[in-house]
Structures are given as structure tokens and as C-alpha cells.
Amino acid sequence: MAIEAAALLVIDVQVKYMEPEPMVTSDGPDLLEKCGGLIDAARANSIPVIYIQHVDPDAPPDPELIAIHPQIAPNADEPIVQKTFGSAFMKTELENVLEQRGLSKLYMCGLATFGCMNHTVLCAVCRGYDVTVASDGHGTSPEAGPVDEQMAHFNRMWERAGATLQKAKEIEQRFAT
């Protein structure tokens, strides 16, 4: 039985952020595996999957680089919401997509912890959505500082803001109940 009014948002897991050097989780280079597990569990339990895709407004789009990573590619019936700002809510169709489908509980995974994940989580909480973040299912660049410290910092901040934090495997199990 699907969780009522729930959706999985997969944020910016695009080729340009995963190749040649992937953004990583505190467990290492396993973001695609964790997001893929969440996607598979959502699909198996009739929970809509919505992809968010960042497009740089100041650069000509390179279809190969901005594509959702092929390892977690969307099905033909799964929406891809394009954005040009950090938040998936700012000047996009995301709220319309959620409203049309009656979705108010959002599970999130993706990139980048310090950027688009952060902005999207906080905007969703401020808009009154029930937000659960995969605490080990968001990734960042080691160049921005120690990955485990970055993830722990943002996880604490999101929890203080009102989001729920669960490991990706726990969310997969939740989807199945």
C-alpha cells in the first residue's frame, strides 16, 4: 500500500555532477546506489517519482551533461521539473505538479547538500510540506570540506527546521509498508 499523498523528489542527480568525479555521501561514492534504491522502492509501491534538473541560465545547455544520470533515468511517465535557481520551488512548475497530484509528503534525495538540496528542503518546509530527507542520500563535493561534517551539519539544520531525517534503507522499508 502506497504512503498517501507522498512523492520522492530526486534533486539534480545529473551527469555533470557525477562524472568524471562524483559528488559523494559520507559513505563514499554510493549516491547513485542510494538514490536508485529509493527510486526502485517508490516505483514498486506506486509512489510518484519527480526528478529535478538544474539548467544554468547563463550557459548553453549541453543535453549530455545536464541529463539525469542514466543509472537512475526517469521512466517516460515521470516528470522532470527544470529549475534555474537553487530551490526546486523557485520559479518552477513543481508546486503545480505536486498540487495536481495531491502530493503533500515529500521524500528527498540528491545533490548538492550545501546547495540545491539545502534550498529545496528549507523551501518545502516553509511551504508546509511534510518533508523527509534521506540523511545518507544526499551528496556533496569533498572540495567543500569534510563530507561527513557537511552532511551532519545540514542534516541537523534540516531537522531543526522541521524536516524528518531517515536513512535511505529506512525510507525504502517505509515505502513498502
Report the location of each language-model feature.
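Short acidic, Gly/Ser-rich segments with clustered Asp/Glu that frequently serve as metal-coordination loops
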Residues: 16-20
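Active-site-adjacent betaalpha module
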Residues: 2-7, 33-40, 57-177
